[in-house]
Amino acid sequence: MLEDALNQYFGFKTFRQGQKEVIESVLAQQDTLAILPTGNGKSLCYQLPGYLVDGIVIIISPLVSLMEDQVYGLQKQGEKRAIAFNSQLDLADRQYVMQHLQKYKFLFLSPEMIVQEAVLHQLEQVKIAMLVVDEAHCVSQWGIDFRPEYLQLGEVKKRLKAPVTLALTATATAQVEADIRQVLLAKNANVYRYSMNRSNIGLFVEQTTDKDASLEDYLSRLGGAGIIYCSTRSKVEEVYNKLRQRYLVGYYHGGLASDQRKTLQQQFSQNKLKLLVATNAFGMGINKEDIRFVIHYDLPDSLENYSQEIGRAGRDGKQSNAILLYQEHDEQIHYFFQRENKEERLALERTVQEKRKEPLTPLQEKWQQKMKELGTSFWLETLKRNEQQKQEQLQKMLAYIHFTGCRRQFLLAHFGEEAQENPYCCDNDGIEIAGEEQLPEKKEAHHWQERLIKIFKDIN
């Protein structure tokens, strides 16, 4: 029985919603698309079958930090045959891995890495048990994080003799689902879509003129562990420095070294830190069940990203909170990035049309490489469509903030779902913050006279 294997390899007695059906489908050699809400344990859907079949499990992942988190999680469980094959490995280590592929059970690669001819050639020589495409929405030009390299994975699959393929994502509209199926999966693929509604998470938006005061107010009322999301690394450090004197807090962003990130994850998981101020680089691959709240200090750029980030709260099923702090003109930083992106794209178009040789920015150089690989007109059209989409996503995010009806209904409708009865719903439905014990503050050393007075007060 699958439950026996689950207990043997992971120490769990029961599956979460959707896990067993997806695993059974994969073990029956059926291509499978699993759309599971954040926090539902998507990684188990390939890890458990990986132990039950012969051969290597290849996992395509878009982010180095996500790969490292997944490998670290497997290693903590005692699995030594997992490795992230990416640019962080030096040349000698990469050569060693390629020459000893049969030693590994779980091999994590970026889409850019697996399409390299030398890598593909080596993979063709070994038995591939399963091809897993994590964050599969990246394959769609209508997805939040379109990555053109994902479009090449269909050809990669053919080269690897079409192993059974599992596509995983937490957010997919009907259009994104259709694109995933077309590029990655066989026509008879099984699709398992589960509601992204997290009924135990209350949804709150506060429109404020003083975010720091609002943040302090919430932290004084909330208990348990929490994440505070900010949009930039500098803002993360600024907010962290305001909180560090009073709370057990750390900060996390993509600029930290790999060992620093691992240490922070460990401290947060073990409750040595109760708060983490972070960019959205933090959260993917995090298995902490008892995060009681997620606060967005800055405005997210899309409902898709917002949904994924708040989904890191309350994975144990207990009441939790998602709080978004909004100050007038918060959207300006997103408009700025959108304008900057468009100007760089237009400048590159002019350079191409006029066949001029001019120095390019790092971003333009990256785009130029994509134009060589995928065709100039295709790539420029993709960039234009991406600009339009980001504008639309931001408008939807702003509409959510100003919405006066049920926020949960608004969020679910965006993903094509109908609202369900929800006793702990949102601020517009009149609920109040569900708090636990207050956050522990840092203990300051008191003067001996103050300590003595406190002792006498306590006795009396």
Briefly describe each language-model feature range.
Residues 223-229, 233-236, 247-250, 254-257, ...:
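C-terminal helicase lobe
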